[in-house]
């Protein structure tokens, strides 16, 4: 976890891997001292009126530093009702069995697609570690030692109009806002997920007019490239 004490992760993405289930997990390393800075963790170090005045850091001392995760499993779960269905849990557990295999393929495919896009005349730039330079690539090389994953972005020449045309011309790749699917997915955020933002807000979020986000799936790269090629030819 690279010294992270708690991790919140969407299992809907690569763990599920097939776009069939919705869920998330909280992972507590069990190593963080939740009592060290009580003023920064008041919910864990002061009486909880919703749970009989319990002070979570004191109540769990015999069990170790698990105040956060225990509170999450009692009061937060109780108040929010975030209870995963048994079938979804089964799908995620099943997905974990092939996660390592799929991630290797996602990463390998994405490397090929990133190289293809970076050499295409209709593409201004590609956002993917292997074709980038500087700080971002250095960090990726340090931490992503088993591959750079399947998520990438690219800036298409011609701005918003070209971005929309590209998306609408895709035949095999799905136009979906999800990521981490076995299928390749593409979306033009400026005209869909972030369309309510002003131009200034879009730019501050790193979303340029021709930006397209891709989640590269497990199809053969020849098929992915063929679909991108015919779509790019129509802008």
Description of each model-found segment:
Residues 1-2:
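Short, small-residue-biased leader/transition segments that mark boundaries at the very start
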Residues 14-15, 221:
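Short strand->helix junction
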Residues 102, 161, 168, 184-235:
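PLP-dependent enzyme catalytic core of the Aspartate aminotransferase-like
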Residues 6:
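Short, Asp-centered acidic motifs that coordinate Mg2+ and/or phosphate
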Residues 9, 15-151, 155-183:
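Active-site C-terminal subdomain of aminotransferase-like
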Residues 9-10, 215:
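Thr-Gly-centered strand-to-loop micro-motif
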């Amino acid at each position: 976890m690279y010294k992270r004490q708690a991790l919140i992760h969407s299992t809907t993405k690569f763990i599920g891997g097939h776009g069939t289930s919705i869920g998330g997990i909280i992972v507590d390393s069990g190593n963080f001292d939740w009592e060290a800075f009580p003023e920064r963790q008041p919910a864990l170090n002061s009486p909880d009126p919703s749970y009989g005045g319990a002070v979570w850091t004191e109540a769990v001392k015999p069990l170790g530093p698990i105040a956060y995760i225990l509170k999450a499993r009692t009061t937060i779960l109780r108040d929010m009702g975030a209870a995963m269905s048994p079938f979804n849990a089964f799908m995620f557990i099943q997905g974990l069995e092939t996660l390592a295999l799929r991630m290797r393929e996602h990463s390998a495919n994405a490397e090929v697609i990133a190289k293809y896009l970076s050499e295409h005349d209709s593409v201004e730039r590609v956002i993917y570690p292997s074709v980038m330079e500087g700080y971002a690539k250095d960090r990726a090389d340090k931490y992503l030692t088993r591959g750079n994953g399947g998520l990438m972005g690219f800036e298409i020449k011609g701005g918003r109009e070209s971005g929309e045309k590209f998306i609408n011309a895709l035949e095999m790749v799905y136009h979906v806002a999800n990521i981490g699917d076995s299928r390749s997915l593409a979306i033009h955020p400026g005209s869909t997920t972030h369309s309510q933002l002003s131009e200034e807000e879009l730019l501050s979020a790193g979303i340029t007019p021709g930006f397209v986000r891709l989640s590269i799936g497990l199809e053969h790269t020849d098929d992915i490239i063929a679909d991108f090629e015919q779509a790019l030819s129509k802008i």
